[in-house]
């Protein structure tokens, strides 16, 4: 078997593995990027070719999680704009900044994300309790923008007014916390994703897991969309502004498409604690590799 064929098979296999991991957690770049470096690709060329190759795989993973995306349109539109803007900025930074400029803070970002994921259940419960208490408070005790789901009033025969307030149900209407702060944090994760992207999914799940009282599977589905938007807009910048190795990108894409479907099937069957443990393990591996 020729060296070129072995190299092609290795890059395809790396794309398959990366697509699988990206659909479940993220950090597939930590497989494909080092593989390209091992075959002699220059770092920036390897990074941009890898980014473009992984875009179809992320799209495949999003399709696999389409059931979990139901009812999340507003969330995706709001945070998607942050991801697109961040990915655009990150891609431009990759092309104009020195290669090592951003690498210094990458381990810190991943470490913060891991801490958020470890303590996510406790923090999410605490923040949700505060939000629900505020929503259930009488109108005079809340701000003008406070909402009450199911509030209604009836007037009795004697002219007296009876007000009925039904507290929101967390399971049916997931509490959303963060507002502009969460938008900025997702934007910053997009900047990081457009620049390099390894463990971007860990960062996003850490942020959204604390901000939303929702299932890990639904949060993971949104994470796939956000990562896809970041990779997609960064890919457009790279295609327009720099050289791409389309052979490597094509091999990664072919493997990542298959991996995205496989990863979605695996990830959707994992219980919340299992998905969280897997995310933490991948994040630790990413941290060790980046610090090595």
Q: Model segments located where?
A:
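Residues within membrane-spanning alpha-helices of integral membrane proteins
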Residues: 8, 14, 51, 106-110, ...
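Alpha-helical transmembrane segments of multipass membrane proteins
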Residues: 16-20, 35, 62, 88-92, ...
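Membrane-interface alpha-helices at helix entry/exit sites of multi-pass transporters
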Residues: 41-49, 73-78, 213-224
């Amino acid at each position: 078997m020729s060296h070129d064929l072995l190299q092609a098979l290795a890059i395809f296999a790396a794309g398959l593995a990366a697509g699988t991991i990206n659909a479940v957690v993220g950090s597939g770049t930590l497989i494909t990027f080092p593989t390209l470096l091992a075959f002699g690709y220059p770092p920036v060329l390897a990074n941009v070719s890898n980014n473009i190759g992984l875009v179809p795989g992320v799209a495949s993973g999003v399709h696999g999680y389409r059931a979990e995306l139901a009812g999340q349109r507003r969330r995706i539109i709001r945070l998607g704009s942050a991801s697109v803007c961040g990915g655009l900025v990150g891609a431009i930074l990759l092309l104009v900044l020195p290669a090592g400029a951003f690498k210094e803070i990458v381990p810190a970002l991943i470490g913060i994300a891991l801490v958020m994921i470890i303590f996510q259940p406790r923090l999410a419960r605490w923040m949700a309790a505060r939000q629900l208490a505020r929503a259930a408070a009488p109108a005079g005790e809340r701000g003008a923008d406070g909402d009450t789901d199911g509030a209604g009033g009836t007037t009795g025969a004697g002219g007296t007014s009876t007000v009925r307030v039904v507290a929101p149900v967390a399971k049916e209407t997931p509490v959303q916390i963060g507002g502009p702060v969460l938008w900025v944090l997702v934007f910053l994760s997009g900047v990081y994703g457009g620049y390099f992207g390894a463990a971007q999914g860990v960062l996003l799940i850490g942020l959204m897991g604390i901000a939303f009282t929702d299932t890990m599977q639904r949060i993971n589905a949104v994470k796939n969309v956000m990562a896809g938007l970041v990779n997609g807009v960064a890919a457009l910048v790279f295609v327009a502004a720099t050289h791409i190795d389309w052979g490597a990108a094509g091999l990664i894409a072919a493997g990542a498409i298959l991996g995205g479907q496989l990863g979605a099937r695996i990830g959707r069957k994992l219980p919340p604690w299992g998905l969280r443990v897997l995310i933490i393990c991948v994040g630790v591996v990413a941290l060790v590799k980046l610090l090595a």
